[in-house]
Curated annotation (Swiss-Prot):
The keyword Cell division does not apply. Belongs to the bacterial ribosomal protein bL33 family. The lineage of its organism: Eukaryota, Viridiplantae, Streptophyta, Mesostigmatophyceae, Mesostigmatales. It holds the Pfam family Ribosomal_L33. HAMAP family: Ribosomal_bL33. SUPFAM superfamilies: Zn-binding ribosomal proteins. The keyword RNA-binding does not apply. GO terms for cellular component: chloroplast; ribonucleoprotein complex; ribosome. It comes from Mesostigma viride (Green alga). This is Large ribosomal subunit protein bL33c.
Amino acid sequence: MAKTKGIRISITLECTSCKNNNNKRSTGISRYMTQKNRRNTPNRLELKKFCSHCNQSTIHKEIK
């Protein structure tokens, strides 16, 4: 029997305020790697996480 593709997939979360903010602590964009269950959350994931470049908790959105 062939194995099916797993329900859990790896996604990347990217800080939304790093793109717009010019007065940051350091250059770059904060990214987190995590997993999500396709069956429970079919739409794009948004989480509030700490951004080391902005030095505050910001919204991180799922990217492709």
